[in-house]
Amino acid sequence: AADIGASAWWLELDGHRLLMDAGVHPKHEGREGLPLLDLVKDTELDAIALTHCHHDHVGGLPVAIRHHRRAHVLMTELSYFLIERVLHNSVNVMQRQREESGIRDYPLYTHDELDEIAPLFQGYKYNREIPWAFQKSRSDAASPTLEFFDAGHALGSAGILVRGKRETLFYTGDVCFRAQTLLKGARFEDVKADVLIMETTRGNRAVPPTFSREAELARLIEAIRETLKRKGSVLIPTFALGRTQEILAALALATRAGKLKHQPIYIGGLGRVFTEIYDLEAHRAHRLHSNLQLHEALNLIVLEKGQAEIMKLTGGRIFVITAGMMSEHTAAHDLAARMMGDERHGIFFVGYADPDTPGGHLKASIPGEPFLFSPSTGQ
């Protein structure tokens, strides 16, 4: 594929069928953002296996299940704690997009539909071999199996090793091999497979030999200090699941070390929910600083709807808020639009921003020259 989004892989093995992931494309709207699920809607499916709970991997799941109500949905136990919250939030977002942008396809599914399919969801521990051929009628042979391996990307993320009678396949999903602030790196050392499907956003870019995560975090903390010193506010656009918690952990450790003052940090409502789950499930995850409880270490305040457009930005505030790519009608987009042009403030990117998104436009902009941030804000 030329870009990321709408991840979905249909696998036929030993007379059985497995769908791995069912995402939506972040740059396409309505049904155009879905995988080509209509191609297989009349074909029997044994199971669906999920790598992790980001929308580009699970956002189309209810639509996939609509034609395959007998298929069980397999995921890690940590993803099991997240999946319903992610999908219910997706309904809320789609309903708002229908109202604000007139996208008639939205919502692609409803809250009631999610409640109906929730009993299909099953969570498993890492490194456990799981039979998945629930439809026994096609073959008397033993069921193929799958096993989840920690991918180190976000809470609950996994690579999926599928074993058949003669062949094995490994699908990584999104993977992070280096330890982050909280999560340890991927644990793929024991994987042996005949076929590898590997997703990577930056696979053709080598990591500079001088790169150091510790040095980058130190630069970020120092930049935050300098911004607050000049009475500006700090915006760190993040995704609610994963990057938000990693950045909050870095801020908590910097505060504990005396590098930052203890002060309110503004996050989104969904970010708060996922942060609570990170805290509650710390003992189940393969993570560093397992005793670090983010809600106890930081003074987290949920930014209410519409507050980003009106609250005062002077005096030094820290926002760790969605959306990571500053999509329109999000708090990060609205805050950035207000901060740009005021040299006191600082906007710091800590992850990928697609070049065609407002975040990508801002990253590519040249200081002092006009640029189009988004259609709603203009230059």
Predicted regions and their residues:
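Active-site neighborhood of phospho(di)ester-bond hydrolases with catalytic His/Asp-centered motifs
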Residues: M20-A22, L45-H54, L61, V73-T76, ...
